[in-house]
């Protein structure tokens, strides 16, 4: 519980600042500086892994999608604008981050997106509920990753898609240093972390048709739950 409160506190500050949006999209001067310094990426590289993580959502998708965590919604609310027939649920542990996402949804007049505060380790949904579960930049923060993996699998329909991206250790020394000495201490990241090989083995053991790769320290993946 202490770690969860540390995470909530860290993301409360983030949710009140536009700095996070600029960093996660690598679109502002400060955001580009962080991308280069911490992640050794430029904007094109940042956009590339995000595009691959989102590639699990088909064009004209009209099913049920769960995004966890939604964060500030900077990466996905514009995408949801193109999916008016979809039934989209956005969940986050941080009410402050989710409040930013809700404001973006309101500005875009999104009528098919609902928001709920909750814990990925105990998702408040029935088994086999969603056609897609999307998780961008979440698993490196989740304090109980095993529970998160189990819950995502549980709420995903047979034949459904699990896709997203998150930090993996061991790919870039400077990034690993910042994660250990800055992001963990601030409450943004929580060990243990996956490696590329460990994540591939995990996804292969749980899902079918695993498409996965990494760009520096960010892994992206698209996989399906067996029918």
Q: Each predicted region: which residue ranges?
A:
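A short glycine-rich, Lys/Arg-flanked "PGG" loop and its adjoining helix->strand segment in the class I
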Residues: 146-158
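A short acidic, Gly/Pro-enriched loop at the edge of an enzyme's catalytic core
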Residues: 121-132
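C-terminal alpha-helical "lid/dimerization" subdomain adjacent to the S-adenosyl-L-methionine
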Residues: 14, 23, 37-39, 43, ...
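C-terminal lobe and adjacent flexible extensions of AdoMet/dcAdoMet transferase-like proteins
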Residues: 221-227
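Short glycine-centered segments of the SAM/dcSAM-binding site in methyltransferase folds
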Residues: 64, 159-161
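Class I SAM-dependent methyltransferase SAM/SAH-binding core
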Residues: 64-122
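Conserved class I S-adenosyl-L-methionine
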Residues: 1-59, 78, 180
């Amino acid at each position: 519980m202490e770690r969860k409160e540390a995470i909530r506190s860290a993301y409360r500050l983030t949710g009140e600042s536009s700095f996070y949006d600029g960093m996660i999209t690598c679109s502002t001067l400060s955001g580009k500086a962080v991308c280069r310094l911490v992640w050794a990426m430029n904007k094109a590289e940042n956009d590339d892994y995000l595009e691959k993580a989102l590639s699990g959502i088909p064009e004209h998708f009209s099913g049920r999608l769960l995004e966890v965590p939604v964060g500030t919604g900077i990466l996905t609310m514009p995408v949801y604008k193109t999916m008016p027939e979809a039934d989209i649920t956005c969940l986050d542990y941080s009410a402050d981050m989710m409040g930013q996402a809700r404001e973006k949804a309101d500005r875009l007049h999104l009528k098919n997106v609902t928001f709920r505060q909750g814990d990925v380790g105990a998702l408040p949904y029935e088994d086999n509920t969603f056609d897609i579960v999307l998780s961008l930049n979440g698993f490196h923060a989740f304090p109980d990753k095993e529970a998160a993996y189990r819950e995502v699998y549980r709420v995903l329909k047979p034949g459904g898609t699990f896709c997203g991206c998150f930090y993996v250790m061991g790919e870039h020394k400077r990034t690993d240093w910042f994660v250990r000495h800055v992001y963990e201490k601030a409450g943004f990241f929580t060990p243990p972390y996956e490696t590329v090989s460990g994540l591939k083995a995990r996804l292969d053991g749980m899902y079918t048709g695993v498409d996965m790769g990494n760009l520096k320290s960010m892994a992206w993946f698209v996989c399906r739950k067996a029918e």
